[in-house]
Regions:
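Hydrophobic ligand-binding cavity/cleft-lining segments
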Residues: 1-49, 151-152
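Hydrophobic pocket/interface hotspot
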Residues: 16, 26, 65, 107-109, ...
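A conserved amphipathic terminal alpha-helix motif
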Residues: 118-152
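Generic structural detector for well-ordered beta-strands
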Residues: 6-10, 37, 64, 96-98, ...
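Intrinsic-disorder/low-complexity, polar/charged segments enriched in Ser/Thr/Lys/Arg/Asp/Glu/Gln
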Residues: 2-6, 43-45, 58-60, 73, ...
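Beta-strand/loop substructures that line and gate deep hydrophobic ligand-binding cavities in soluble
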Residues: 62, 80-129
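Glycine-rich portal/gate segments that line the openings of hydrophobic small-molecule binding cavities
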Residues: 38-81, 137
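Short strand-connecting beta-turns/loops that link adjacent beta-strands
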Residues: 12, 41, 70-71, 100-103
């Protein structure tokens, strides 16, 4: 499954980069993210609760930073298992920041996701709807945090 989102944040690119590449800052913006901890250089672990159809579950995920080119590009690999190991997820994500002007930044996010196990059996349509909803909630929370912080 491929996810691609593009949105604008009213803040300078350096501010967006600093926020979005800080796990402590960005984690509260991710729907269902309970905690994030650094487990090594450029390596993080998180717990994420999600709901897909009638199933509520939690994934334990490991995130590795594959590449960073501040303040314009980063790529990540995420791997995780659902509690009870009923499902596995693997994703490669890319984040690009483009300066629109000194006060606005375009964010482009793409992710190739492979989900196997019981959750992988859900129809592609349902998975896309869940991913889209999570993405929209993330964008709203991220904008609020960055744009409100920029006003103070």
């Amino acid at each position: 499954m491929k996810i691609e989102k593009s949105f604008t944040v009213v803040a300078p690119r350096e501010n967006v980069w600093e926020f979005i590449t800080s796990p402590e800052s960005v984690a509260p913006c991710i729907p269902g993210c309970e905690q994030v901890e650094q487990v090594g250089p450029k390596k993080y672990r998180a717990g994420i609760k999600i709901k897909i159809g009638p199933i509520r579950t939690k994934f334990k995920v490991d995130i590795d930073v594959l590449e960073e080119r501040p303040p314009e590009f980063a790529s990540y690999q995420t791997q995780g298992v659902e509690g009870g190991k009923a499902s596995r997820i693997k994703a490669v994500s890319k984040l690009s920041l483009t300066e629109i002007d000194s006060a606005a930044t375009e964010v482009l996010y793409t992710s190739e996701i492979n989900l196997i196990g019981r959750l992988g059996k859900f129809s592609q349509g349902m998975m896309n709807k869940v991913a889209d909803s999570i993405g929209e909630d993330f964008i709203l929370a991220l904008r609020k945090e960055i744009e409100v912080a920029g006003e103070s």
